[in-house]
């Protein structure tokens, strides 16, 4: 279990708002925190062990500039409790890519072996999230783009979905494209989209983070689907998985999520009241 955030604003720096959003999902992970931003030219990243207020002493977020950004709070389910495992993870091949992941890849070892055999990358951690990052980067490189477009991202994601098993909800920066969010074909981990009247968008693990920061809930990211918010604020949506079967993790309703969150149109607190036994 981890908490992830993605944010786009038409003109303003998003690092402070990502900081505020990470506070709202802090309950999903206290091991480490990180923020990455993109200003259409440069990617900035800071991550450390600790809770959000320890890693970022103020909401100024250590001068992370950019109108597109992602954030992560970590609860370790794979890898170890070391700063090298803190997210977001970064790759510069074939373009600047930064990824924040909530979930567990059940075939991570198989995918890691496959990638090592391609000689496309090396690995610095034991994290399955680093595997997911490099798998996407590898598939993106295979599109052989001249000018990177959203169609190349969707094509790469379709290949990722063919190969990956397990649960994943992801926010990602792809330089030259924008903010990407996608969710596994079973919808095991939650992911929601919100919007403000000023044209800014937020993606978050829980709807409670949207409402706390004044975003109107748009919809859940559908299982097996991806959303791209371009650097110009244009939203594209696409189905990437060949087969979809909605099977959310029940622990999201009764343990992981805040009671004021709504997951796939179901209130977490209402679900708990319906399922927990009563004393008689």
Residue spans for each PLM region:
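A short, hydrophobic C-terminal helix/tail in secreted or cell-surface proteins
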Residues: 275-280
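Conserved short alpha-helical segments that host acidic/polar catalytic motifs at enzyme active sites
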Residues: 1-223, 228-274
